[in-house]
Design a protein with these regions (language model features):
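Conserved NTP-handling cores and scaffolds of large molecular machines
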Residues: 18, 22-25, 69-73, 133
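Amphipathic alpha-helical coiled-coil segments
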Residues: 59-73
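Elongated periplasmic alpha-helical coiled-coil
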Residues: 37-39, 71-75
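Non-DNA-binding regulatory cores of transcription-related proteins
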Residues: 75-157
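Helix-rich terminal scaffold detector
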Residues: 1-24, 28-63
Length: 157
């Protein structure tokens, strides 16, 4: 399986999230479950069931993030002017007006940046854009067989 490429900042944020979940959040919810259990009949104890559900969701998130980290490495700095993982790229789909250009961060969904949509580097369009530069026209065959063409109008690394 190919490794996920993450920025140093995202990798560190995810490590901190796992640590907080393991050492602070999950133990606090486990205590909440224990206190609710002491209230008696569990079949009608809403606090108990809510705390168990909360624990399950948080534990699932911890496991998901741990899996991402175990299968990730720090992305190298993108080459200047070339679309790579962690590039911010603006594209114009064929037939669209220039004001309809769309801007994306090429990267993992966990890269979350304010105001930027994420495009996976493993998606058909994301992978086709890798290695291209401003002004390049890129034709892509989508998973459903449809063909689209985009023009790279801006690359920021």
């Amino acid at each position: 399986m190919a490794k996920h490429l993450l920025s140093k900042e995202t990798y560190a944020r995810l490590e901190a999230e796992v640590a907080e979940l393991e050492h602070t959040v999950l133990p606090a919810v486990a205590d909440k479950i224990g206190r609710a259990r002491e209230m008696g009949d569990l079949s009608e104890n809403g606090d108990y069931h809510a705390a168990k559900d909360e624990y399950g969701m948080l534990n699932d998130r911890k496991n998901l993030v741990q899996g991402i980290l175990e299968n990730s490495e720090i992305a190298p700095a993108p080459p200047a002017g070339e679309v790579a993982v962690l590039s911010v790229v603006t594209v114009l789909f064929a037939g669209d007006r220039p004001e309809d250009a769309e801007t994306y961060l090429i990267g993992h969904i966990e890269e979350k940046r304010d105001g930027l949509e994420i495009m996976s580097p493993s998606s058909p369009i994301g992978s086709a854009l890798l290695g291209h530069a401003e002004g390049d026209h890129v034709s892509v065959t989508l998973e459903n067989g449809a063909k689209v063409s985009v023009t790279v109008t801006k690359v920021t690394n």
